[in-house]
A protein has these predicted regions:
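Hydrophobic alpha-helical segments and their helix-loop boundaries in membrane
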Residues: 2-260
Length: 260
């Protein structure tokens, strides 16, 4: 009995010692919190794509291009959305890579243990991207308008720094800036197709063929022009080149957008 008691006592002491050693080890975030964080990111992913990336500009420009060509529902919305997503992935790849290296890698390595630090690290590359687009297009008025409505003094913009602009003010200002840039590019896309419409309409009137719908005549010429100039590569390439990057001068971006 004494031997059995000693054995049980030794086992209890060993278990207690093991528990003490385990409690002394640093603990990171629990698996439950990691799963909750992952589900939150997945849920907010569509909103993040819409609000903080170049998706808005690309999708709006492609939609305006479809209207300018007068092709109705061709290409289908699924095609334009898919093309916009793929172009967004190409443009946002450097920014996403920064987020991964500066936030995800330290978080997985245990160097970041609280969500506030993780958020601060992850949002900085996105903030740099959004500020770069606003600066390249010169659409600071949208940012000042949002900040003014939030009660922030913008009477002297020279005193403001990027640190004074939070995400609540930056995101809507960025979206308004992207919409303005998209409409500017859409206007430039409309011009050649508008010329074709005017020429064809004038020819039909001069030939007393006013009963013939101009769309039946202009659409083949629009498609021919678009194919001859390799329109898809030209439009998508210009779209991806219109976003400010570290290796692209602001003057070149402004020329693509039509601000030069």
């Amino acid at each position: 009995m004494a031997a059995a008691g000693d054995a049980l006592g030794g086992a209890y002491a060993g278990a207690a010692g093991a528990g003490t050693k385990d409690s002394d080890r640093p603990r990171g975030l629990s698996p439950v919190l990691n799963i909750m964080l992952l589900l939150t990111v997945i849920t907010l992913a569509p909103s993040i794509v819409l609000m903080g990336t170049c998706f808005i500009r690309i999708l709006v420009v492609l939609g305006l291009l479809r209207q300018a060509m007068g092709t109705g529902s061709l290409p289908p919305p699924q095609v334009t959305v898919s093309l916009s997503l793929m172009a967004t992935m190409v443009v946002m790849a450097p920014t996403v890579d920064r987020v991964y290296k500066e936030a995800v890698v330290p978080f997985r390595a245990g160097e970041i243990t609280d969500y506030r630090t993780l958020w601060d690290k992850a949002k900085q590359p996105m903030r740099d991207f959004m500020f770069a687009q606003i600066e390249a297009t010169g659409n600071w008025s949208s940012l000042y308008m949002v900040m003014s409505h939030r009660g922030i003094d913008v009477s002297d913009p020279s005193r403001l720094t990027r640190a004074d602009v939070d995400m609540v003010s930056l995101v809507p200002a960025f979206m308004l800036s992207e919409l303005r840039a998209a409409f500017m590019m859409g206007f430039r896309l409309y011009l050649p197709f508008l010329v074709i419409d005017m020429v064809i309409a004038t020819m039909l009137i001069s030939m007393s063929m006013m009963m013939l719908p101009p769309v039946l005549v202009t659409l083949p010429f629009k498609l021919l022009l678009f194919v001859l100039v390799d329109g898809w590569a030209l439009v998508v390439g210009s779209l991806m080149g219109s976003f400010a990057r570290p290796d692209v001068a602001t003057a070149a971006v402004n020329f693509v957008l039509g601000y030069a």
